[in-house]
């Protein structure tokens, strides 16, 4: 083939060959000697070289330091490279720290600092507020989330636990049960488990320890402790007040079906005894005689009213769950205060965002707690005052987060969980409160609905409907 080429062709081939060799030499001079790098990695040599690269118009200074064992034994080694570029077009500094590329699975850390755009330092929380402004914002936001639900309670048309408000109160109790159970299992417990979750960027194939199961187990134990604490306190208070299990006495309806005899039902209700009827008749006759004489119709000893001791004991029992729920609400507000205080340490915008988030979930939470207090025997004003007292817990949590500078209380911005036991213990207390049948059910209808003896007209209607009402003394 060489014979077929003319002189011009041979000259062109020669020029191309020299050009290729020149490119190889330039590449060797501009990017380092690959052979020397390999020898350095294999044998642990260290060297320094400095050169000028006229193709790019900037200088490079490379420093390599290696201390490692032979790669054939699987030992790890590290490389530190420092590069200083003076370039007309770039003008920035790069600092690279990485492990050897010859061992797969090793991590790489790169830090780039561009002049004028920031400073490298330890990661922390940026504070854009001075101390006085920080406290003013944090405490003001805490007062807002505590006062807003208080004013919402004025719009609820429930004055007390009376038959007139029974239907609406039952709806509010159902709302409270769903809200508190959802808050316990979907907010408090997952938030307590979040710091112990695995990092999402963990590489598969690397060994990992199960030491993280200890904190997760402690969260479960604190939830169980909250449930047990509620049950123990509830039983203790009932025992002290003498509220043992008892029948609520007079006026409960009992339905009996007599299979085979009659398809109708017999309802046994308590009616006034003969002695009571005779005493009432005597009182009426004495009153009539006094009226004829122009005297007072009021009996000497005053009207005799039956004492419903069963209902009073029932009311005492119902208040236990209400006050225990109030204690759980106090602890819950403490964690809300921790979150607000820690978030404002991270900046004004983050604090405002966290305040709005807490406010949106706090309003329905407080409405549910209000319904439980009313159901437990409190009037509307008493329930509102007790709800307002729980704001002390939120203020205390905010102050704790600010005084500890985030610390353990608010190390996670917008989610400061405080001491590790607060969230799971509160969640267990709330779950136990709603699991108690006395917290989600209204007291039985008063006995006055069953005491009156049906008249002749009502008896006729009852006979037509097949229901027999029998009076028992």
Curated annotation (Swiss-Prot):
Post-translational modification (record): Methylation at some His residue by METTL9 leads to reduced zinc-binding. Rapidly phosphorylated by CK2 following Zn(2+) treatment. This phosphorylation is required for efficient cytosolic Zn(2+) release.
Modified residues (Pros-methylhistidine): 66
Lipid bilayer topology: Multi-pass membrane protein
Biased composition (Polar residues): 431-442, 463-473
Residue intervals passing through the bilayer: 11-31, 138-158, 169-189, 214-234, 388-408
UniProt-annotated location(s): Endoplasmic reticulum membrane; Golgi apparatus, cis-Golgi network membrane
GO molecular function: zinc ion transmembrane transporter activity
Reaction(s) catalysed (UniProt annotation): Zn(2+)(in) = Zn(2+)(out)
Record protein name field: Zinc transporter SLC39A7
Organism: Sus scrofa (Pig)
Name of the gene this protein is made from: SLC39A7
């Amino acid at each position: 083939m060489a014979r077929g080429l003319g002189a011009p062709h041979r000259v062109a081939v020669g020029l191309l060959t020299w050009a290729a060799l020149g490119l190889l030499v330039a590449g060797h001079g501009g990017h380092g000697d690959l052979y020397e790098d390999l020898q350095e990695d294999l044998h642990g040599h260290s060297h320094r070289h400095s050169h000028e690269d006229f193709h790019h118009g900037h200088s490079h200074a490379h420093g390599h330091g290696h201390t490692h064992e032979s790669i054939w034994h699987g030992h790890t080694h590290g490389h530190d490279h420092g590069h200083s570029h003076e370039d007309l077009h770039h003008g920035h500094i790069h600092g690279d720290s990485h492990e050897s590329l010859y061992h797969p699975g090793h991590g790489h850390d790169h830090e780039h600092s561009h002049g004028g755009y920031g400073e490298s330092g330890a990661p922390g929380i940026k504070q854009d507020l001075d101390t006085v402004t920080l406290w003013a914002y944090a405490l003001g936001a805490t007062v807002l989330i505590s006062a807003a639900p208080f004013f919402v309670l004025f719009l609820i048309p429930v004055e007390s636990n009376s038959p007139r408000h029974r239907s609406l109160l039952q709806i509010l109790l159902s709302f409270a049960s769903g809200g508190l159970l959802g808050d316990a299992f979907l907010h408090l417990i997952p938030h307590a488990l979040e710091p112990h979750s695995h990092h999402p960027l963990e590489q598969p194939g690397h060994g990992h320890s199960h030491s993280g199961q200890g904190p997760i187990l402690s969260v479960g134990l604190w939830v169980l402790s909250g449930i047990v604490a509620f049950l123990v306190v509830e039983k203790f208070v009932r025992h002290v007040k003498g509220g043992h299990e008892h029948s609520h006495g007079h006026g409960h309806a009992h339905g009996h079906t007599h299979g085979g005899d009659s398809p109708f039902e017999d309802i046994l209700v308590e009616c006034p005894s003969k002695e009571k009827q005779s005493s009432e008749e005597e009182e009426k006759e004495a009153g009539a005689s006094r009226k004829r004489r122009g005297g007072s119709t009021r009996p000497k000893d005053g009207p005799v009213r039956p004492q419903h001791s069963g209902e009073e004991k029932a009311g005492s029992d119902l208040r236990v769950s209400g006050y225990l729920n109030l204690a759980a609400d106090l602890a819950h507000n403490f964690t809300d205060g921790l979150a607000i205080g820690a978030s404002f340490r991270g900046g004004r915008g983050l604090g405002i965002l966290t305040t709005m988030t807490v406010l949106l979930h706090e309003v329905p939470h407080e409405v549910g707690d209000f319904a439980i207090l009313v159901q437990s025997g409190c009037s509307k004003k008493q329930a509102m005052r007790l709800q307002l007292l729980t704001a002390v817990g939120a203020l205390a949590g905010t102050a704790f987060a600010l005084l500890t500078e985030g610390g353990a209380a608010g190390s996670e911005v917008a989610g400061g969980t405080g001491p590790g036991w607060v969230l799971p213990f509160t969640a267990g207390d709330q779950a136990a409160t709603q699991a108690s049948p006395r917290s989600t059910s209204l007291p039985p209808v008063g006995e006055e609905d069953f005491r009156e003896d049906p008249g002749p007209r009502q008896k006729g209607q009852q006979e037509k409907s097949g229901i027999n009402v029998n009076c028992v003394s």
